[in-house]
C-alpha cells in the first residue's frame, strides 16, 4: 500500500458532511457523457474520479484529458492508471474541438496524463488541440493543465508559444511530502515550469493548485503560496485531498471549510488575482468562472 503516513492517524468515520455529493444522474450529465463517448474522448473528471463530475457535466462543462488514459508515472494520490500508453491519436485534436463546439463552450480546459515516453512529452498534441480550437471556436479561451515536461528540451517553450490563455501546472503538495506523494516529480522543477511559462508569455495567465489533507501543516501551505506568487502565478486553487482507494495515500486530515476560506483570503493578500479555496475546489472545477468567463 502506498501510504507514507502514520497509520495511527485518527479521522472521523466516513467523510465529513461538507464533502458528500449526490451521485450523477441528471439528463445534462447523461447528455454530455454521450457527446464525449461519441467523440472517443477522455476526461480527467472520470479518470481521476472527481467528486464534482455530476455538477460540472450537468452544467455542460468538462476537462478534456488528451494523450490517452494511461500515465507513465505513479503518484500516490492519483487514480489515473499507470502503464505503457498507446501512441497519440492524430484525430484527437479535431475530435476535441468539434465536441467543445457542440458543447458551446466559452472556456475549454485541456489536460493530459504524463507521457515521459514521448520525445516532446506530449507538447505537440497540446499545441494541435489549441490550434484546432482556435479554428473551430475562435472566441473561446483555452486553458492547459500540463505535466512538467521534465527532460523534454524545448517542449515547454513550444507549448507556451501556442499562446494558451491560461497555463496551469499543479504543485499538488508541499515540498516535504514530495518523496511520498510525487516521487518522480520535483517541487523546485514545477516552480520553475510556472516561472518560465510566465517569463515566456507575460500577458498570459498562470495557475497552480495544491491539495490539503496529505500531512502538511498550515505554515507549509502558506510557504507554497508565497513560492507560487514569487514564480508569478496569477490563479490559485486549494482543495481537499480525497483518497481514491485503500491503495492510495491516506487522508491525514479533513480541513474544515472555514480553514479553506481563511487560507483563500490569505492567498489574495499575497497578490493572487483569483483564488478558489474550498474542500471540493479542483483545478478545472469552475475554471471558466475563475478566468472570468461564463460557460453557461
From Swiss-Prot:
Name of the top EC class for this enzyme: transferase
Reported cofactor(s): [4Fe-4S] cluster
Radical SAM core domain residues: 57-273
A GO term, aspect molecular function: metal ion binding
Any Pfam family hit: LIAS_N
Broad class of where this protein is predominantly found: cytoplasm
InterPro entries: Aldolase_TIM, Elp3/MiaA/NifB-like_rSAM, LIAS_N, Lipoyl_synth, rSAM
Cleavable signal peptide: none
Residue numbers binding [4Fe-4S] cluster 1: 45, 50, 56, 284
EC code(s) of this entry: 2.8.1.8
Domain of life: Bacteria
An annotated GO cellular component: cytoplasm
Residues annotated to bind [4Fe-4S] cluster 2: 71, 75, 78
Cell compartments where the protein resides: Cytoplasm
Keywords associated with the record: 4Fe-4S, Cytoplasm, Iron, Iron-sulfur, Metal-binding, S-adenosyl-L-methionine, Transferase
Details of cofactor binding: Binds 2 [4Fe-4S] clusters per subunit. One cluster is coordinated with 3 cysteines and an exchangeable S-adenosyl-L-methionine.
Pathway: Protein modification; protein lipoylation via endogenous pathway; protein N(6)-(lipoyl)lysine from octanoyl-[acyl-carrier-protein]: step 2/2
UniProt-listed SUPFAM superfamilies: Radical SAM enzymes
Gene3D superfamilies listed in its UniProt record: Aldolase class I (3.20.20.70)
Catalytic activity, as annotated: [[Fe-S] cluster scaffold protein carrying a second [4Fe-4S](2+) cluster] + N(6)-octanoyl-L-lysyl-[protein] + 2 oxidized [2Fe-2S]-[ferredoxin] + 2 S-adenosyl-L-methionine + 4 H(+) = [[Fe-S] cluster scaffold protein] + N(6)-[(R)-dihydrolipoyl]-L-lysyl-[protein] + 4 Fe(3+) + 2 hydrogen sulfide + 2 5'-deoxyadenosine + 2 L-methionine + 2 reduced [2Fe-2S]-[ferredoxin]
Protein name from the UniProt record: Lipoyl synthase
Gene for this chain: lipA
Amino acid at each position: 500500500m502506498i501510504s507514507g503516513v502514520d497509520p495511527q492517524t485518527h479521522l472521523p468515520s466516513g467523510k465529513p458532511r461538507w464533502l458528500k455529493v449526490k451521485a450523477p444522474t441528471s439528463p445534462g450529465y447523461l447528455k454530455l457523457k454521450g457527446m464525449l463517448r461519441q467523440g472517443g474522448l477522455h476526461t480527467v473528471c472520470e479518470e481521476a474520479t472527481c467528486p464534482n463530475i455530476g455538477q460540472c457535466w450537468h452544467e455542460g462543462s468538462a476537462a478534456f484529458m488528451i494523450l490517452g488514459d494511461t500515465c507513465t508515472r505513479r503518484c500516490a494520490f492519483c487514480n489515473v492508471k499507470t502503464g505503457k500508453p498507446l501512441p497519440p491519436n492524430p484525430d484527437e485534436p479535431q475530435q476535441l474541438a468539434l465536441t467543445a463546439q457542440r458543447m458551446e463552450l466559452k472556456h475549454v480546459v485541456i489536460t493530459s496524463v504524463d507521457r515521459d515516453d514521448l520525445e516532446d512529452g506530449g507538447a505537440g498534441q497540446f499545441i494541435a488541440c489549441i490550434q484546432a480550437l482556435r479554428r473551430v471556436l475562435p472566441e473561446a479561451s483555452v486553458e492547459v493543465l500540463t505535466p512538467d515536461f521534465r527532460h523534454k528540451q524545448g517542449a515547454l517553450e513550444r507549448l507556451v508559444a501556442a499562446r494558451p490563455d491560461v497555463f496551469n501546472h499543479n504543485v499538488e503538495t508541499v515540498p516535504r511530502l514530495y518523496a511520498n506523494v510525487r516521487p518522480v516529480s520535483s517541487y523546485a522543477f514545477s516552480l520553475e515550469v510556472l516561472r518560465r511559462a510566465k517569463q515566456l508569455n507575460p500577458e498570459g495567465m498562470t495557475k497552480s493548485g495544491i491539495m490539503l489533507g496529505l500531512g502538511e501543516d498550515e505554515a507549509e501551505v502558506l510557504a507554497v503560496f508565497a513560492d507560487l506568487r514569487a514564480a508569478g502565478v496569477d490563479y490559485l486553487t486549494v482543495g481537499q485531498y480525497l483518497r481514491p482507494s485503500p491503495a492510495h495515500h491516506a487522508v491525514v486530515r479533513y480541513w474544515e471549510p472555514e480553514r479553506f476560506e481563511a487560507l483563500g483570503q490569505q492567498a489574495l493578500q499575497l497578490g493572487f488575482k483569483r483564488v478558489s479555496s474550498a474542500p471540493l475546489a479542483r483545478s478545472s472545477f469552475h475554471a471558466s468562472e475563475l478566468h472570468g468567463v461564463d460557460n453557461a
